[in-house]
From Swiss-Prot:
Domain of life: Eukaryota
Compositional bias per record (Pro residues), positions renumbered to this chain: 71-82
Organism: Homo sapiens
Pfam families: DUF5529
Protein name as catalogued: Uncharacterized protein C11orf91
Region (Disordered) residue spans: 55-94
Length: 193
């Protein structure tokens, strides 16, 4: 048996069909081989942006082709939701109140300093107002944590370690945490009742 043949009914190279055409209308030259028919194919695929029917790009050759064509059909309607609001059969997807609210993603994490300039806002919930008086405690704790971490890094790198300041900062941090913990249960019980 010759090499490359597996059976008597396998097709030879001359019997194989041509590869499939993915866009047959682009390769179909039987209808017309004029450049106008090629332009019409692309005109069906792309909607012109201008109302006059001129193609996007505005090349001089394209203008002469568009002038040779008959009057274009009226432009298609805009996609749903992009037309004028008077032509929409449904109300706007966004309520009008959403546009007036400023975008402040960090407002939840920010507590303004207490003082007469703090005005009660409808956006700020009432339970957070007792927290304003103790706003300095978390900030002080952060500062203490940073100083403690700096001392620990100095120990790791071998640049020197001050055991007195480290123990003092640790004790101060523990004291602040205890003070914060004793105040929190009172706040919770007051807010629950």
């Amino acid at each position: 048996m010759p090499k490359g043949r597996r059976g008597s009914h396998s097709p030879t190279m001359s019997q194989r069909s041509a590869p499939p055409l993915y866009f047959p209308s682009l390769y179909d030259r039987g209808i017309s081989s004029s450049p106008l028919s090629d332009f019409n194919i692309w005109k069906k695929l792309f909607v012109p942006l201008k109302a006059g029917g001129a193609p996007v790009g505005g090349a001089a050759g394209a203008r002469s082709l568009s002038q040779a064509l008959p009057a274009p059909a009226p432009p298609p309607p805009p996609p749903p939701g992009l037309g004028p609001s008077s032509e929409r059969p449904w109300p706007s997807p966004w309520p009008s109140g959403l546009a007036s609210i400023p975008y402040e993603p960090l407002r939840f994490f920010y507590s303004p300093p207490p003082g007469p300039e703090v005005v009660a806002s409808p956006l700020v919930p009432c339970p957070s107002t007792p927290r304003l008086a103790s706003a300095s405690h978390p900030e002080e704790l952060c500062e203490l944590e940073i100083r403690i971490k700096e001392l620990e890094l100095l120990t790791i790198t071998g640049d020197g370690f001050d055991s007195q300041s480290y123990t003092f900062l640790k004790a101060l941090k523990d004291e602040k945490l205890q003070g914060l913990k004793t105040k929190q249960p009172g706040k919770k019980s007051a807010s629950l009742s």
